[in-house]
Design a protein with these regions (language model features):
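PLP-dependent amino-acid enzyme catalytic core
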Residues: 1-201
Length: 201
């Protein structure tokens, strides 16, 4: 999304991604005109490196989730859901760093306080779920997962941690077999190729 926005605004961008990022995602970023650089095995390593790089080179750093403007933008998804499905009583959202679910649930729960918000994470990388259980941001090593868009940890002091604690009613942890099954279901029954992170929810 950031790469697309930079292309639309004519802004030159540099996007850092973990080493294990899918080639499809990397190519999509490159096709938007941004330079892509790889660093680290985990999202937190990549974020910390990117933040330091931006500071040292006098660049603007944009977090993929730990930013109120980013979360507000993702809240428009919550608006669309409630606009199209005003009577829905449950919303499930894939969770990595927590930006998307923070944005969606902030608006959705404002519209309907009785709404159930379910955070969905791959069992192999459920850092937010385990951190909320422990009531602190944990530094947990993630296992490989088909859901690379939600993989990795959460940076210390992330604003999404408190938001997720307040807004998520429960978590569902999804196995790798379930992720693959959901991906195949979308291909077979809906003729849609979705990314692993989407199939988690």
């Amino acid at each position: 999304a950031s790469a697309f926005a930079m292309k639309e605004l004519g802004i030159k961008g540099l996007v850092f991604v973990p080493e294990a990022t899918s080639s499809v995602k990397v190519n999509a970023i490159k096709n938007s005109g941004c330079e892509v650089r790889f660093h680290g095995e985990d999202g937190v390593d990549t974020e910390n490196f990117a933040r330091d790089y931006a500071t040292k080179n006098n660049l603007t750093y944009l977090s993929p989730y730990n930013d109120f403007d980013v979360i507000s933008g993702q809240g428009t998804c919550g608006f669309e859901i409630m606009d199209q499905l005003p009577d829905c009583d449950v919303i499930s959202v894939s969770v990595g760093g927590g930006g998307l679910i923070s944005g969606i649930s902030s608006y959705a729960k404002f519209s309907n306080k009785a709404l159930d918000i379910i955070g969905c994470q791959p069992s192999n990388s459920a850092v937010m779920a385990h951190s909320i259980d422990a009531d602190e941001i944990l530094d947990i090593e993630s296992e490989p997962t088909h859901s690379d868009g939600t993989a990795g940890g959460i940076e210390k002091g992330a604003i999404t941690f408190e938001l997720c604690k307040q807004l998520i009613d429960r978590f569902e942890l999804i196995s790798e077999n379930e992720i693959i099954m959901n991906l195949n279901n979308f291909i077979d029954n809906h003729r849609m190729l979705i990314e692993g992170a989407a199939s988690v929810a």
